[in-house]
Amino acid sequence: MRIGLLWLVPLFTLTEGTDGFLQQKNDGRRTKEIVSMVEERHPVHEYEVLLQVTYRDPEEKRELKRFLKLLKSPSPSLRGPSKIIRVKATTYCRSRKGFLECACEDSYTWFPPSCLDPQNCCLHTTGPVPSCNCSLRGLRQSINFCERAKVWGTFEIDEKFPEDLWNSSSDVYAHYTVGIENQLKEAYRRVHGFESVRVTQFRKGSIVVGYEVTGSTSPPELLFAIEQEAEKAQEALRRQFPVKYGSFRVFGKAPCNSISFGFGSENDEYTVPCSSGFTGSMTVRCQSSGWQITRESCVLSQLEELKKELRMIAGKITEAGVASLVQNLSTILLQSPSTTVGNLGSVVSLLSNISSLSLANSLTVSNLTLMNVINIADHILDSASITNWTILLQDAKDASSQLLKTLESISSLIPSMALPLNFSGKFIDWKGTPVTQIQSTRGYNYQMEMRQNASLPIRGHVFIEPDQFQKSHPKTIISMASLTFGDILPITQRGNAWVNGPVISTLIQNYSISEIFLNFSKIKGNLTQPRCVFWDFSQLQWSNAGCQLVNETLDTVLCRCSHLTSFSMLMSPFVPSSVVPVVKWITYIGLSISIASLILCLIIESLFWKQTKRSQTSYTRNICLVNIAVSLLIADVWFIIAATVDPSVSPSGVCVAAVFFTHFFYLAVFFWMLVLGILLAYRIILVFHHMALTTMMAIGFCLGYGCPLLISIITLAVTQPSNSYKRNDVCWLNWSDKSKPLLAFVVPALTIVAVNLVVVLLVLRKLWRPAVGERLNQDDKATAIRMGKSLLVLTPLLGLTWGFGIGTMANSHNLAWHVLFALLNAFQGFFIFCFGILLDTKLRQLLSNKLTTLSSWKQTSKRNASDTVTQPKCLRTFNILQHRGMYALSHTGDSSSDITLTQFLSTE
């Protein structure tokens, strides 16, 4: 049995004069054209013609090879002088069971790493020989065949970019192409295996030239040889062109390579012209995933003509003129299905201008005109255009809002006698209803249903109760809905949120209502925390003013609003709806109490600061306590500032400053807690060692403020240049796949918590022994009391409560972890005041004496005021020795290590 095989044979042919037969035979599968000049009069065109030759067995294949070697005479079917300069067999295929299996001939390979038809073929590279398998059913056109090894190169010519370089038929294009190719051929002609070089592209950025070298050796060998000749190639090019130094590059693998944009290395950015029939240009950037369009202004030439026509009739516009413009616009878009970024912007601009002129001249629109407008909107709201909308909104931030406003304005121009009307497109639904007596008894109902990506239907329902129409009747009610608007109207509110339902707009002209109900289907079931919102055209953002959530089920959300506009709902991902409100209130209440407690703590410390200096242990402890209180107070204030800043509205510098200072001062809190823990460990372990106070303080302040400042500055310097320092939704350190500066807070904080936990265990171990003189049955009780007091004091002072944050990270959906973490840390300032000040025996006694003194002074003042003759009285002054043992020695029989520990903890 014989199996039919297919052989692909490209022939390179030169022909002078007219294109003739060759151009007619070019089916677009793999045609290359190089323009040069011969004797300055006759352009020479080089074509690559692909022939598919079928053979049945290896013998026939050998016969064909011998034939191809002899094939040198011009083909008689070509008109005009012509010559075949090269014939090469590149790819062979065999058909098996409905599949086509193809492989490359010797010294050929697949470029780029796909084969034949990228849509219907799969390249297998795991075997000894890479093969291309295609389904014969879907195979249409072959694009990528086996080719010789390729090396790509690029360089810049330091000249202003002439627009004619985008026209391959121009003399300027021929001048640069021929000159560059001749110089490169001369430089590479001695390279082993070199076959050809051709200019593939010109791009803006001075003049950026891309070229391609083809050879018969392996790709690594060809690349190495071309790199060795780089200096010679640059010298040759500079004889004719001012090549920029440092711009010459060659590479064997192009991260980005496409027919439209050519090749480039990562982060290359170029401006290229739009395709034929469009005006404008595109800016593309090479990323790891390939070429990405960053800016685009490609507009159909017909749309530009329509803009000119509108400008000409603007002063004398009529209803017929509006109808004609809208009809022409609809026809143009139907004939050109491509929705470019430039086309989107132009269509929005045209419709907006038509709407403004119609309103200014009190024009009405016909049913046909309105239908054309809805068809145009349905075309540009295609979900396939969302990527282009995203690019457009980078420069024209109000484009989507302007389109929504325009559709509402044009809808208001339809006369009431033309209603009812209903237009249902794939991406927009429109319904106009004349108001009659029925609305007074039944109210108003609007229902829509759409599908997104063949999923379950997405529904929306608007209901206005009958009592809203009792006093008077409006003429019309118009409602429209779209799913696409939810993707293109920007989300500016803080937090991760998406529009999770259709956007529904309801218009009633010259009429006000006090209540409207809207029911939305959820697009994504895993989103929670629904918020009923409307689109604020003046602020260009979603707002919840006048709207409230009535009910939520598994699949729907019911909203109630007190005004009419465009409504939808915002929802956040993967956060239990019960967590955020509870934690939010705990945080705000806790921070308020903490700030007040910390201020009170600092006031008390300042009142009795002199008394704390009499003992080095007491003094160092209070210095740590004051710095913890100051840092936590400032950190809480900056936290509140960060919580009130909207990153999407406020200048980015404000948010960056809030993130930096919040990060710095919270780190300072932890590092001062570390200093406190180290000092406590020092007093426990090195009982008889005494360090100078200045040395202690130098170490303390370097750790307490130096380390946090260094970490904060490095974090900012490393991540801010790439705009990955802060989150986009809230003012706090970022956490994303590409950048995780939040680790600069989490890692130091949890490390310090772990260190301080060890210190607490040391304290408890030191306390776990009976005091001298106590009976055995009293030992356990006394020890337990001392350990309990110490643990109560040390837990908030050393930041151990932050360890519960691990629970929130391990199980973010557990309400208990979130509430516990918020309770313990939002009230941390209050705990420091209670356990650091009120449980401090000495400070408590000083405060008590101060209050007693004030009370005595008030009583004396009253007595003096009532007596006619007063006798001088001497108030009892505070005697620090009066309370000896209550602070310094809690157990007179303990060892010196216990005395020091008691002084430091001051809990007795």
UniProtKB/Swiss-Prot annotation:
Positions of transmembrane segments: 589-609, 623-643, 659-679, 698-718, 743-763, 790-810, 819-839
Q: Where is this region: GPS?
A: 532-577
Domain GAIN-B: residue ranges: 434-577
- Show which residues constitute the signal peptide: 1-20
List residue numbers at the site (Cleavage).
564-565
Q: Which residues lie on this side of the membrane: Cytoplasmic?
A: 610-622, 680-697, 764-789, 840-908
Q: How is it modified after translation?
A: Autoproteolytically processed at the GPS region of the GAIN-B domain; this cleavage modulates receptor activity.
Subcellular locations according to the entry: Cell membrane
- How is this protein's activity kept under control? Forms a heterodimer of 2 chains generated by proteolytic processing that remain associated through non-covalent interactions mediated by the GAIN-B domain. In the inactivated receptor, the Stachel sequence (also named stalk) is embedded in the GAIN-B domain, where it adopts a beta-strand conformation. On activation, the Stachel moves into the 7 transmembrane region and adopts a twisted hook-shaped configuration that forms contacts within the receptor, leading to coupling of a G-alpha protein, which activates signaling.
Bilayer topology term: Multi-pass membrane protein
The UniProt similarity line reads:
Belongs to the G-protein coupled receptor 2 family. Adhesion G-protein coupled receptor (ADGR) subfamily.
Full protein name = Adhesion G-protein coupled receptor F1
Task: Name the source organism.
Answer: Mus musculus (Mouse)
Query: Taxonomy-wise, where does this protein's organism fall, top ranks first?
Result: Eukaryota, Metazoa, Chordata, Craniata, Vertebrata
Gene it is expressed from: Adgrf1
